[in-house]
């Protein structure tokens, strides 16, 4: 809520014309009682997790709230049959490899470059042909590190680290998972 104080400072002007709904996530306990004024400045708080819903219900029980799961389509993101997995891995030269998948924004706070350094240390122990790291991200994000430069600097240019930077369909993303 701290990023939107300006909005809640004018909530009486907004709510006179339209309801205010806050789509919210809060990740941990203890209850953030200091958020009560912000929660109560909404007509509804839509909570992304059960924990968030519990927080809102306990910090501001008088505000209307609901739990709206932050989730994926279970018809797309579901377990595959072993034969389909084997075929997918084989088509990408991932047979008999330990595969790690990182699906994230390449932002410094996400430690994307550090992950590659750690992965190299892992490969140095198990063998560079035994594992692959797939990173679904923008390798040259202005808020991140130059991941391509890092893999070159570390000598990880033989398929140890693979990048998937294009926008992909949910089905294609589910396949990687």
Residue ranges: model-predicted function:
Residues 41-50, 66:
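A short beta-strand/loop micro-motif in the catalytic core of glycosyltransferases
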Residues 23, 48, 68, 102-104, ...:
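Short hydrophobic "strand-cap" motifs at the C-terminus of beta-strands
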